[in-house]
């Protein structure tokens, strides 16, 4: 930049104010990145799900069960390729704070319905032969320091089995095909679950996940399933996996609106703080700006000086994004099981830089315009 040294000299004339202003930007951009990551985490379920999967639950509520006998009936519907069933286990490992999702799965069809959750064949075959076997996501394995072959006790809190301890052998680890895939789950066999719960739960499942041949057939198949069980004791609600994930997120409230509201307040406050800082800086240098104009600097150069300072402060504040890049993965590990994986994407960082530039420009344009319009005679009165 032609006048870069002059801009830097003006920036460092008030070092304490410079540090505080950059710090304000850094904190705001860190919060921006954190809020963006949390928003992505909650909306990711709807973004990464497969278009060829449907979810069938009890129409009353997901906590109500549906009969296992529905499985074969649904499988006979034209367009249905595979179907698997799951139950929420609700177990506790050592301490209630050690939450992670545990599912009773149908091992015969799990991999066909969820091909993106990858388990090595040898580990899966061992799991199939082990009544007490379990497959665990890589994130949960790392979180607790488990390894294949470990025997893990988990107490359930539901099904009338409070404080009953189930023993599991870790037979394998699954990994997601993409970084955003959920690797925190714990799977174990339906047969082991069925033999341990009261009779009223033995023929009941929590929900079905259905893989279909053509995503375009999803509305027809969903309607067919629900019509089959209309007016039955166990009516169903079938929707795409994306719609199901969005409905689940909505139970937490309007996360996106909340995050947008917080972000707007933060950046509006930052705009006021930075704009006031630049205005004070221009007033303090009125005589210097007058001298620059008197010796031949054009008005546009003065405008560029002030805007350059404001944008330089904004870019320096992007250190907050770097801090977020380092801190959020550690936060994600600490919150494993409580929140979806927190991933700082290139898009989030790019939006952060753009937001910084916009605020930097907006906070500097009025003081810069005032300096540009300033008359030399008026400015030099203070000399």
Regions found by a protein language model. Give the residues of each.
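Hydrophobic alpha-helical transmembrane segments of multi-pass inner-membrane transport and secretion
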Residues: 15-40, 252-288, 311-319, 359-362
């Amino acid at each position: 930049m032609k006048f870069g040294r002059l801009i830097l000299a003006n920036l460092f004339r008030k070092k304490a104010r410079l540090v505080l202003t950059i710090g304000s930007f850094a904190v705001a951009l860190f919060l921006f990145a954190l809020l963006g990551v949390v928003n992505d985490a909650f909306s990711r379920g709807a973004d990464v799900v497969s278009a060829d999967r449907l979810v069938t639950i009890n129409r009353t509520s997901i906590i109500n069960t549906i009969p296992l006998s529905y499985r074969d009936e649904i499988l006979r519907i034209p367009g249905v390729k595979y179907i698997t069933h799951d139950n929420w286990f609700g177990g506790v490992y050592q301490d209630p704070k050690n939450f992670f999702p545990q599912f009773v799965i149908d091992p015969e069809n799990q991999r066909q319905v969820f091909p993106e959750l990858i388990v090595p064949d040898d580990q899966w075959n061992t799991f199939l032969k082990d009544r007490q076997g379990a497959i665990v996501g890589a994130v949960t394995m790392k979180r607790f320091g488990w390894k294949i072959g470990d025997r893990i006790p988990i107490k359930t809190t539901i099904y009338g089995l409070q404080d009953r301890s189930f023993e599991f052998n870790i037979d394998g680890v699954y990994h997601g095909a993409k970084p955003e895939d959920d690797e925190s789950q714990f799977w174990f066999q339906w047969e082991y679950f069925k033999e341990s719960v009261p009779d009223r739960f033995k023929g009941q499942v929590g929900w079905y996940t259905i893989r279909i041949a053509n995503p375009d057939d999803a509305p027809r198949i969903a309607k067919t399933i629900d019509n089959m069980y209309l007016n039955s004791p166990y009516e169903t609600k079938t929707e795409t996996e994306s719609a199901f994930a969005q409905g689940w997120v909505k139970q937490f409230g309007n996360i996106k609106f909340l995050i947008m509201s917080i972000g707007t307040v933060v950046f509006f406050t930052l705009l006021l703080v930075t704009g006031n800082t630049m205005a004070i800086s221009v007033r303090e240098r009125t005589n210097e700006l007058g001298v620059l104009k008197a010796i031949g600097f054009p008005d546009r150069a003065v405008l560029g000086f002030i805007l350059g300072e404001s944008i330089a402060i904004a870019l320096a504040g992007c250190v907050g994004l770097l801090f977020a890049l380092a801190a959020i993965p550690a936060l994600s590990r600490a919150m494993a099981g409580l929140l979806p994986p927190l991933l700082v994407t290139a898009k989030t960082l790019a939006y952060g830089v753009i937001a910084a530039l916009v605020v930097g420009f907006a906070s500097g344009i009025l003081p810069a315009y005032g300096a540009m319009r300033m008359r030399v005679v008026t400015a030099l009165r203070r000399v």
